[in-house]
Design a protein with these regions (language model features):
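Secondary-structure transition/capping motifs at alpha-helix termini
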Residues: 13-16, 114-122, 130-138, 159-171
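Beta-sheet entry/capping signal
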Residues: 32, 91-93, 103, 137-141, ...
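Glycine-rich beta-alpha loop elements in corrinoid/cobalamin-binding modules
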Residues: 1-56
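Structured alpha-helical segments in the cores of large, soluble enzyme domains
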Residues: 3, 92-100, 124-132, 157-160
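Conserved small/polar residues in nucleotide/adenosyl-binding loops
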Residues: 172-176
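Flexible loop/turn segments at secondary-structure boundaries
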Residues: 2-4, 41-43, 83, 101-105, ...
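Canonical Radical SAM [4Fe-4S] cluster-binding loop centered on the CxxxCxxC motif
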Residues: 86-122
Length: 176
């Protein structure tokens, strides 16, 4: 993931005493990293962007999008820091997919987070179990841009019911 590459670069920059400008120029060479100060933006009269051009040789002409293709391989912590006080969202959160198929014109996230990628039922179930066992939470918020569009929703819920039966499992959707 790009965060690790940026962190590694930052550690190298600190170790070698780089100035901020050198760090930013090096970071811009990592795929998926956009450094605004390394680009000149020109605008049309109506305020829309006319062009974006690099102002130094280290900045690529076009910044490539980076995505995590296989969500099953994304790091997910098995143990969380849990507060000692009651908080508003006193539950753990589990992401089941990224992206959205609907393509609503008003939704920026639906376009930015493409393509749609899903975790497998087994990975979701294992992560949910581990979260409950290691945090003491008895609620999990299953999240995504559109959870009801998860293609394996029914098998996922059936699998989770195997171990949540005495505790119950609820799913609320705005269309219900």
């Amino acid at each position: 993931e790009v965060n690790l590459e940026i962190t590694d670069l930052y550690m190298q920059a600190k170790k070698e005493g780089w100035d901020k400008q050198r760090f930013l120029q090096q970071a811009a060479q990592i795929g998926g990293v956009y450094v605004p100060s390394l680009y000149d933006v020109s605008y049309r009269e109506d305020g829309t962007i006319d062009s974006v051009k690099p102002n130094c040789p280290q900045a690529p002409e076009k910044v490539t999008k980076r995505i995590i293709a296989d969500l099953d391989k994304v790091y997910y912590p098995k143990q969380f820091v849990v507060p000692f006080i009651n908080i508003v969202h006193d539950r753990s959160m589990l992401e089941i997919q990224r992206g959205c198929l609907r393509g609503c014109r008003f939704c920026q996230a639906g376009f930015i987070c493409r393509p749609v990628r899903e975790k497998s039922v087994d990975v979701i179930n294992a992560q949910a179990k581990a979260t409950c066992e290691n945090t003491g939470y008895d609620e999990i918020s299953i999240s995504s841009l559109s959870t009801s569009d998860y293609t394996k929703l029914e098998p996922m819920l059936e699998k989770m019911l195997e171990w949540t039966e005495p505790k119950h499992l609820s799913l609320i959707h705005i269309s219900e």
